[in-house]
Each structure stands twice: as C-alpha cells, then as structure tokens.
Amino acid sequence: MLFATFATAIIAFIIVRNSHAKCEKKEEVKNDIHLLADWKLWLGLTLMQVSFGSFYNFFTIYETDFGVSLDMTIYLWSFGVIMEIVMLFSQGRFLQNNLLTILQITTFASAIRWFLVYAFPQDLVVLFFTQSLHALSFALFHSAAISYLFHTYKHQALAQQFFSGITYGLGGFSGALLAGYIYEIFPRELFLSSALIAFLAFVSLRLHAQRNR
C-alpha cells in the first residue's frame, strides 16, 4: 500500500511538472475556475470519491466479516477490474451524450451499488452485480468528469489539477478517514453510509445541472 501510494505521488509529480512545462510554452490562459460559484459541481464530484472510502479500504474486511471467503473477495475484486477495463475500451459512444447527465447516472448507480452491498453482504449473485457497476461508478464517472471539466473551463490544465487534488486527494482521504470511524462504531452500516454519501453526490450534481439549464 505504501509503495502504491509513493508510486502514485511520483507519477502525479511528473505529470504536473510536465504540464507546467507545456503551459509555459503556450499563451497564458485566464483562470475561469470559480470553486465557490460552481460549488455544487465540485461538491458532487468530491462526495463521489468520499463514498468510495468504504470500498477501497474495507470491502474485503467487511465481506469476510459476513463469512465470504478471502478467495471469493479476490474474485469479486478481479471481476470489478475486468468490468472497468471493458468500459474504458467501449465508453466512447457513451461520452458522446450529455456528460452532466452521465455524471448523475453514475453517482445514482453508485448509491444503489453501495446500498446493495449493505443489504446483501453474503449474496454472491448480488455482490457480483454490484462489482459490474464498477464500470459505471469508476470508469465512466472518471472519464465523464474529466471530459466535462475539459469542456467547461478554458483553463483545462488547472481544472484537471483541481480534480485530482480536491476530488481524489481530499475526497479519497476524507472517505478513508470517515470509513474508519464508521467501521469502528457502526460496522454493519458502513456501506449504508456510502450509499447516502453517493446519493448526496447525485443530488448535488442534479442541482448543478438545473442551475446550468
């Protein structure tokens, strides 16, 4: 885990350094990103990653607590990754649609996903179905979010850096921390809390979409 975190930090540093080098060769782009003005958008994107805190940090522990074998949790993880890869290869046609609508669909699908994990923690059929939703809640959401920010803001490089830092950085850290506290106090309701957070992300993005009609 520490190696993966360190490697991610190194890669992120290289990407940011290269992006700065490229930006210096281009004309300066005026910053048109206003976090407070678009707070519903950024809150929704961040809450989505907060909801993943339970999954990334406690899914295996949660399932084995309910009697699912460790080998089966490995199969579940692997199936989710396969679904993610399939979506990444076939998402082009989906991204041609309204990106903000896709963000709403994927956050709502994530709320359903986490609720099903909470409601049926031992049902393997349901669990494999929830892992198939990883194609939506991670792969399609991530690509739609990047594309939406790219088309929304003129300062595209800064928008992507905010997305990585705020959404994945702050959101991921907060989600892991919150999941740890919830698991200590209410372990059974861990994924119910994730479902509620993902639903709040959906509501926030929905409100943002209504404002931008």
Give the residues covered by each predicted segment.
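Structural signature of the two symmetry-related core transmembrane helices
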Residues: 101-116, 195
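Helix-to-loop junctions at the C-terminal end of transmembrane segments
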Residues: 86-99, 183
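Intracellular juxtamembrane helix-capping segments at the cytosolic ends
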Residues: 139-154
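Helix-loop boundary and gating motifs at the non-cytosolic
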Residues: 37-76, 142-143
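A late C-terminal transmembrane helix in Major Facilitator Superfamily
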Residues: 156-186
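Hydrophobic core of transmembrane alpha-helices in multi-pass small-molecule transporters
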Residues: 46, 125-140
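Juxtamembrane intracellular "pre-TM" segments in multi-pass secondary transporters
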Residues: 17-47
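A membrane-interface helix-boundary motif in multi-pass transporters
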Residues: 1-6, 180-200
